[in-house]
Amino acid sequence: MQELKDRIVKEGKILPGNIVKVDGFLNHRVDCAFMGRIADEFQKFFDLNNVDLILTAEASGIALSAICAYRYGKPMVYAKKAKSDNIEGGLYQSEIFSYTYKKKVTLLVSKEWLHPGDRVLVIDDFLARGEALRGLCEIVQAAGAELVGIGCCLLYTSPSPRDRTRSR
């Protein structure tokens, strides 16, 4: 998507460790109209008749996923990184390493909101090392749901997260 490339060049920054900082429009200050155009672009790649819900990880993926879910007329579930007192009925969970926070975290999804047979589209802001996506895929599998697609706004190409994610 050319508009995304242009925004990265114009507004993005490269931080030490080759971290791409695009928090001025993607994952801190969110340009919702632009996110809507990204959702429209994603829609070209997925059969939305074959999607029951959108799944993402807390926190940076929520804005894009919520806009996609709204545009597609689907519910959105996000995997929490901390258990709260209001989660009932059991949990699906997967431990991942967060490169953002430099520590292990556990992704949690209530069994109340993800069911066997659900057809799940995973949407996230970044695919860097593939840890969040690995965890989300493990949760989908544990639920007996079906992963029907993965959409990521930005993909780091080195080291290759795509190869690690495909191998799972």
Where are these regions (language model features)?
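Active-site-facing substrate-recognition patch
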Residues: 1-51
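Short glycine-rich phosphate-binding loop at a beta-alpha junction
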Residues: 51-58
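Conserved acidic residues
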Residues: 52, 118, 148
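Short Gly/Thr/Asp-enriched flexible loops that form oxyanion-binding sites at enzyme active sites
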Residues: 63-72
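Short, glycine/charge-rich flexible loops or terminal/linker lids adjacent to PRPP-binding catalytic cores
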Residues: 74-120
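Acidic, divalent-metal-coordinating active-site segment for phosphoryl/phosphodiester hydrolysis
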Residues: 126-133
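Internal alpha/beta core interface subdomains
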Residues: 137-154
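Conserved small/polar residues in nucleotide/adenosyl-binding loops
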Residues: 156-165
